[in-house]
Amino acid sequence: MSSEHIQNKLALLPDQPGCYLMKDRQGTIIYVGKAKILKNRVRSYFSGTHDSKTQRLVQEIVDFEYIVTSSNVEALLLEINLIKKHDPRFNIRLKDDKTYPFIKITNERHPRLIITRQVKKDKGKYFGPYPNVYAANEVKRILDRLYPLRKCSTLPNKVCLYYHLGQCLAPCVFDVEASKYKEMQDEIVAFLNGGYKTVKNDLMKKMQEAAENMEFEKAGEFRDQINAIETTMEKQKMTMNDFVDRDVFGYAIDKGWMCVQVFFIRQGKLIERDVSQFPFYNDADEDFLTFIGQFYQKANHIPPKEIYLPDDVDSEAVQAVVPDTKIIVPQRGNKKDLVKLAYKNAKISLNEKFMLLERNEERTVGAVERLGEAMGIPTPSRVEAFDNSNIHGTDPVSAMVTFLDGKPSKNDYRKYKIKTVEGPDDYATMREVIRRRYWRVLKEGLPMPDLILIDGGKGQIDSAKDVLTNELGLDIPVAGLAKDDKHRTSQLLFGDPLEIVPLERNSQEFYLLQRMQDEVHRFAITFHRQLRSKTGFQSILDGIPGVGPGRKKKLLKHFGSMKKLKEASVEEIKEAGVPLNVAEEVHKHITAFNEKAKNTEQK
């Protein structure tokens, strides 16, 4: 739609809260946002200047819709549902759930204690999340020793080892009262909510009583249980002096990016954190609210008893998302320090991201720019590198890889089977490949490279330049990569006459050339091996009576490789679906071939 159409719609926007849906040329919803005042927010996209990522969004907008709500809170809830429904590609996309393990008491007649990563609305009791399965298993192991709930997923018809160990009440054989299960479940809930110290004190009394009664084996069992509680439940530093489950949020923004850190505090301990980074398009606090709304829509993010938020966040809106959780914006003390710590970690995470981006820029785009400067040519943003591969002239192939701004562009890689060259002639092979590649580039109007790299020296470079200039009328810089006696990149040859381009061996531009040469060599060798494997298999079977193209294919499919066929017996060859007499001929032929190869090696 025209910009006039958008301007007309902008003039009609109301001074009310609501959600807006941006659409592209196909009518696809590409972004959903919310606003306290729709008129101001939506108009801001089409006026003033924006950073590059917002500009990319605006360039794709050809239409928009909006929905008025009665409040900002209602707008937040609607936005969450619209994002969930349409999954717009410019909205915050939380990474796939890192599914943390939970301990669960199942809602069954004879309940079990299990570890699960799936949180369902099945009336089971869930505790966690735990930072990893090992930590969850450690806690479960203690509970199994203290509370003998059943272990079997289906009830057997006789007692198992757990019954004899005192870790199961054997409901498969004995009647167990529901009140007994309720008592154990209540104690487990208390234990996991921080009441393990009471359990520990009870065990210490029992241990002392057993020791006084000379029941040393029983006292030893109590001692082991106490040790398990101490090492598992008390080994982590306490972050709070109570046992309330909390999620602590902090966020930082920089260069159009937001990082949100969530600290999971369970039973007073910081057990894990969640880190999310994403570009944001609205006000930071608005996108932060959107993040929280989406965060608790995830099945494995169970809202805790309390959520701590930084200042200037609309706590009323968050409360609407998680109505059963207490929302706190701490003003002082340990709670405030935790929010500050989450912010500090978010800021560090963003700084690290940009430092890594700068380093990556240095080794890619920066290296390409300096390579062009060293060669005296414009920045070679698109480089196409070639390498030939053959063994004594058999199955000659060539390969081309493409690097865009210093990064491999694998969709632009190409393989070539050499058609016109007989025997090992590297120069003629290079001429054929350059001719085929750039004749097609001209014919189909494909992007021209800024630099062609040849794996070789003067002869290969001259062959490529001759075809480009005299046959195709192209003027593309051609350089050669020479290797030392250890087959490592040693120097770059360029110019007329050819000269060594002075590059520091520890420079990023030299490392870039190494990566290009290694990549094209790998690609060519891999293609050549694939070709040899296929043609080698078929050539050995050529001339065997009763083995035509169909049976060659059948043998290839059955054995998969020449090595396996060489090791096969007559009976094994017959299992490939060929008659006995043909299997005998194949075995006889391969045995003779193996003997001949062995004698050749000995000579």
UniProtKB/Swiss-Prot annotation:
<dbReference type="InterPro" id="IPR004791">
    <property type="entry name" value="UvrC"/>
</dbReference>
<dbReference type="Pfam" id="PF08459">
    <property type="entry name" value="UvrC_RNaseH_dom"/>
</dbReference>
<keyword id="KW-0228">DNA excision</keyword>
<keyword id="KW-0267">Excision nuclease</keyword>
<feature type="domain" description="UVR">
    <location>
        <begin position="197"/>
        <end position="232"/>
    </location>
</feature>
<dbReference type="InterPro" id="IPR001162">
    <property type="entry name" value="UvrC_RNase_H_dom"/>
</dbReference>
<dbReference type="GO" id="GO:0006289">
    <property type="term" value="P:nucleotide-excision repair"/>
</dbReference>
<dbReference type="InterPro" id="IPR036876">
    <property type="entry name" value="UVR_dom_sf"/>
</dbReference>
<comment type="similarity">
    <text>Belongs to the UvrC family.</text>
</comment>
<dbReference type="InterPro" id="IPR038476">
    <property type="entry name" value="UvrC_RNase_H_dom_sf"/>
</dbReference>
<dbReference type="InterPro" id="IPR035901">
    <property type="entry name" value="GIY-YIG_endonuc_sf"/>
</dbReference>
<dbReference type="GO" id="GO:0009381">
    <property type="term" value="F:excinuclease ABC activity"/>
</dbReference>
<feature type="domain" description="GIY-YIG">
    <location>
        <begin position="15"/>
        <end position="92"/>
    </location>
</feature>
<keyword id="KW-0227">DNA damage</keyword>
<dbReference type="InterPro" id="IPR050066">
    <property type="entry name" value="UvrABC_protein_C"/>
</dbReference>
<protein>
    <recommendedName>
        <fullName>UvrABC system protein C</fullName>
    </recommendedName>
</protein>
<comment type="subunit">
    <text>Interacts with UvrB in an incision complex.</text>
</comment>
<comment type="function">
    <text>The UvrABC repair system catalyzes the recognition and processing of DNA lesions. UvrC both incises the 5' and 3' sides of the lesion. The N-terminal half is responsible for the 3' incision and the C-terminal half is responsible for the 5' incision.</text>
</comment>
<dbReference type="GO" id="GO:0003677">
    <property type="term" value="F:DNA binding"/>
</dbReference>
<dbReference type="Pfam" id="PF22920">
    <property type="entry name" value="UvrC_RNaseH"/>
</dbReference>
<keyword id="KW-0742">SOS response</keyword>
<dbReference type="Pfam" id="PF12826">
    <property type="entry name" value="HHH_2"/>
</dbReference>
<keyword id="KW-0963">Cytoplasm</keyword>
<dbReference type="InterPro" id="IPR047296">
    <property type="entry name" value="GIY-YIG_UvrC_Cho"/>
</dbReference>
<dbReference type="InterPro" id="IPR010994">
    <property type="entry name" value="RuvA_2-like"/>
</dbReference>
<dbReference type="GO" id="GO:0009432">
    <property type="term" value="P:SOS response"/>
</dbReference>
<dbReference type="InterPro" id="IPR001943">
    <property type="entry name" value="UVR_dom"/>
</dbReference>
<dbReference type="GO" id="GO:0009380">
    <property type="term" value="C:excinuclease repair complex"/>
</dbReference>
<dbReference type="InterPro" id="IPR000305">
    <property type="entry name" value="GIY-YIG_endonuc"/>
</dbReference>
<dbReference type="Pfam" id="PF01541">
    <property type="entry name" value="GIY-YIG"/>
</dbReference>
<dbReference type="Pfam" id="PF02151">
    <property type="entry name" value="UVR"/>
</dbReference>
<dbReference type="InterPro" id="IPR041663">
    <property type="entry name" value="DisA/LigA_HHH"/>
</dbReference>
<dbReference type="GO" id="GO:0005737">
    <property type="term" value="C:cytoplasm"/>
</dbReference>
<keyword id="KW-0234">DNA repair</keyword>
